Amino acid sequence: MSLSIDVTSLPSISSSIFKNESSSTTSTLSGKSIGRNELYVSPDAEAFNKYMLSKSPEDIGPSDSASNDPLTSFSIRSHAVKTNADAGVSMDSSTQSRPSSNVGCDQVDFSFNKAVKVNANLDSSISISTDQKREKSKKDHKNGKHYPKIEAESDSDDYVLDDSDSDDGKCKNCKYKRKYFALRMRMKHVAMQLIEDL
């Protein structure tokens, strides 16, 4: 028996995740683990103006506000600075004192994932082929009920009756007795018909 499996045209699996998730990778060049804390400022115009005036225009990014209306709701990261070309973010409040590109500085890399789509396409087919041998069918017949094979010229006392038509023969309780007598009667008629035709 041979079995071959080949899967065909299964529907493609696609899933979309629309979330704004940020994952931070911490680099420990100086042996210290760096984390970034969030500082939430009260939503009033005075605090917002003070914060915006303390930063240069190129340092202000989307992370400075949590909504489209900064006066209503906005969040401030305590050490927010612009990202350098080497994808490192300096943890210092001043970028001029210690640039993030120097070796030995603590750096944190942020990666933002939005609208992630996962597509998995599986093209295959299923085919099953079986080869059944005769040996198996023979075994199935052996498992069934078996009857003894009777030869035409058998001398066994279990199956052959004597020549007399009496019920007191050797095979008085034989289950083939009726069939045997019916067959013998037909054979006699055939023999008599052949003699008459000759």
Curated annotation (Swiss-Prot):
Where located?
Host cytoplasm
Q: Which Pfam families match?
A: Rota_NS26
Output compositional bias ranges, type Acidic residues.
153-166
Keyword Disulfide bond: yes or no?
A: no
Where composition is biased (Low complexity), the residues are 17-30
GO CC annotations, alphabetized? host cell cytoplasm
Q: How does it assemble?
A: Homodimer. Interacts with VP1. Interacts with VP2. Interacts with NSP2; this interaction leads to up-regulation of NSP5 hyperphosphorylation and formation of virus factories. Interacts with NSP6. Participates in the selective exclusion of host proteins from stress granules (SG) and P bodies (PB). Also participates in the sequestration of these remodeled organelles in viral factories.
Family membership noted in the UniProt record: Belongs to the rotavirus NSP5 family.
Q: Any idea what this protein is called?
A: Non-structural protein 5
